[in-house]
């Protein structure tokens, strides 16, 4: 029997439809939620209580998406975005909401996700860890794009849900020293003969100065290197070129790697590409709270999974306890060992392990008194399948995605742990990103 294509009735008309909707709340990603024809509609850039004229852009069985055309009413919580690039750049998405309401929204979203996905509530919701709302980022990666037609390179952040690079002149969430580099750096890149071979540019502001790391897919000419050196000297920054294989060419810089300190006596060095928390002020407070919550004693054994370069491991080792740090990136494990040595901490050992793999034969797997987890957005679900082998009395889980925290809470609850404390860590003001810290104790 022949079958003929039959277009869905009015599908194109439905997508181009302009409708006026009442926004009731925000989802955990910061988008406004409204109702239309019995379905939820997600609308970026709007706030609860606002009425907005929108255009439908996507239709699914259970929900739709729309873009804001204009506001018909304004929320009292709406503020004027500080950034001139806010409506094009995809870096921030909540600058239009007052800071107080941003934090209340994030706390509410965190508690709601935990209740919905893990069916549990914390015995205590602790005060959020908060800091400066502007100029807090000590590190950022800017994208570049070479335009074949104009022979120019654009430097900036990508647009929301797009590969397009937005040309920016400054950034109010970057450290001032880094934000002030963007315009002259953009001018410099467009003077290089090898500008079409440039990748991303990393900006770092830490204890031993500002670093500019330029990714290049081929070796730069001597003239280009001279221009980079002149820029570094004029702006008093360290400048490094990173090659295709990760090799580093220091154009101007100190003999030591970038580093930051914790508690004045713990020095954490890292190489470009290593993960470190971008908000130094919040990171220090977060580490202090984790150490306080775990309350480690000198005779205890502590396991730090996803330990990075030792951000939590080394402060925990100051207690005199035996600390074991485990990390999946070998270069970071090597750096963590160096950091322990330069901070004169001998009771800490680091292992390289793929924490999503079979851990049964790992030498470090065994009974521990305390456990700290600081995984990436994917969470620590696979690692927690080995909880019976570890049996810690207390667990601190530092999360950069409340959905994975809620999911990972399930095996903890099944093994007899209770959620004793939960708190927001506002690592990224002006964005929807939610970081959190949770304390679980064996009941």
UniProtKB/Swiss-Prot annotation:
SUPFAM superfamilies: Nucleic acid-binding proteins (SSF50249), S-adenosyl-L-methionine-dependent methyltransferases (SSF53335). The keyword Magnesium does not apply. The active site is at 400 (nucleophile). Keywords: 4Fe-4S, Iron, Iron-sulfur, Metal-binding, Methyltransferase, rRNA processing, S-adenosyl-L-methionine, Transferase. Transmembrane segments: none annotated. Catalyzes the formation of 5-methyl-uridine at position 1939 (m5U1939) in 23S rRNA. NCBIfam families: PRK13168.1 (NF009639), rumA (TIGR00479). This is 23S rRNA (uracil(1939)-C(5))-methyltransferase RlmD. It comes from Shewanella woodyi (strain ATCC 51908 / MS32). The lineage of its organism: Bacteria, Pseudomonadati, Pseudomonadota, Gammaproteobacteria, Alteromonadales.
């Amino acid at each position: 029997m022949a079958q003929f294509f039959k277009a869905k009735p009015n599908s194109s008309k439905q997508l181009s439809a302009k409708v006026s909707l009442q926004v009731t709340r925000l989802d955990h990603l910061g988008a406004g939620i409204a109702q239309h024809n019995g379905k939820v509609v997600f609308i970026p850039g709007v706030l609860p209580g606002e009425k907005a004229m929108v255009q439908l852009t996507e239709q699914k069985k259970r929900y739709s998406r729309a873009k804001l055309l204009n506001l018909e009413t304004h929320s009292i919580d709406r503020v004027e975005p500080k950034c001139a690039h806010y409506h094009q750049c995809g870096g921030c998405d909540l600058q239009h909401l007052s800071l107080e309401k941003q934090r209340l929204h994030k706390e509410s979203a965190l508690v709601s996700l935990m209740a919905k996905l893990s069916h549990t509530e914390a015995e205590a919701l602790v005060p959020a860890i908060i800091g400066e709302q502007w100029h807090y980022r000590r590190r950022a990666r800017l994208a570049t794009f070479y335009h074949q037609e104009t022979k120019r390179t654009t430097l900036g952040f990508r647009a929301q849900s797009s590969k397009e690079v937005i040309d920016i002149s400054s950034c109010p969430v970057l450290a001032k020293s880094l934000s002030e580099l963007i315009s002259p750096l953009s001018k410099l890149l467009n003077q290089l003969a090898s500008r079409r071979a440039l990748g991303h540019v990393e900006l770092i502001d830490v204890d031993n100065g500002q670093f500019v790391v330029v990714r290049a897919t081929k070796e730069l000419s001597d003239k280009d290197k001279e221009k980079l050196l002149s820029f570094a000297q004029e702006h008093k920054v360290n400048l490094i070129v990173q090659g295709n294989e990760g090799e580093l060419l220091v154009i101007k810089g100190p003999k030591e790697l970038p580093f930051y300190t914790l508690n004045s006596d713990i020095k954490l060095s890292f190489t470009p590409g290593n993960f470190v928390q971008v908000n130094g002020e919040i990171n220090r407070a977060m580490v202090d709270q984790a150490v306080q919550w775990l309350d480690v004693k000198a005779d205890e054994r502590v396991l730090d999974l996803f330990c990075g370069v030792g951000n939590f491991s080394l402060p925990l080792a100051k207690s005199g306890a035996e600390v074991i740090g485990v990390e999946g990136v070998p270069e970071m494990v090597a750096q963590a060992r160096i950091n322990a040595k330069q901070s004169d901490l001998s009771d800490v050992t680091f292992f390289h392990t793929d924490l999503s793999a079979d851990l049964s034969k790992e030498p470090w797997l065994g009974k521990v008194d305390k456990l700290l987890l600081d995984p990436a957005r994917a969470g620590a679900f696979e690692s927690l399948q080995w909880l019976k082998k570890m049996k810690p009395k207390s667990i601190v889980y530092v999360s950069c995605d409340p959905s994975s925290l809620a999911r990972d809470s399930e095996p903890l609850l099944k093994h007899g742990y209770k959620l004793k404390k939960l708190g927001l860590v506002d690592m990224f003001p002006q964005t929807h990103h939610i970081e959190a810290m949770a304390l679980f104790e064996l009941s």
